């Protein structure tokens, strides 16, 4: 059985996947981007995928929200992971030698104040671990705390995220529904057939009517025309209720 995640080994997705508890034995399959993770799960009945959906600093991970909407996959659980970044560089460099850094877009966003204070230029790669491959004289990488040492790189600075309480929520996804013995939350994707005044309010008021708390609401464009959306709603209730 396969477990797909955004690789390579050492990414936050990998660390979240290591926290995934299951009675099944999974072969870890690293993939190059998050869309590919969800697409692979949708085609593999025996697979599970681990994807980030929300960060306490950045908010919703849009590429994941959009990919979930366009593939037949279902959330079976979630994992919360503390996010801690370090700056890595060439062994001959100090912090003062660095003029540019690389990382994945969410990592850049979550360390942007630090980047500006250091007056670094920055650019993007597809994963935090891939950024380590960009390291050379004067070029650094922003990657998970402890990951750079594994690949033989030098730590230039630690705990560089802009906010100390940085947590990412990951979803455990499969391509089929499955009975969960004691579910306590449900994620809905609501796609209205047409737009009208008060549409979202009427949807949310339905949950209020039944005294159901909502812990996450996110709108994403349908990508058909401007102003037309579907909505993710996470309700603190079991789906069979």
Language-model features, listed with the residues they occupy:
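Domain-level signature for soluble enzymes in the chorismate/prephenate branch of the shikimate pathway
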Residues: 1-241
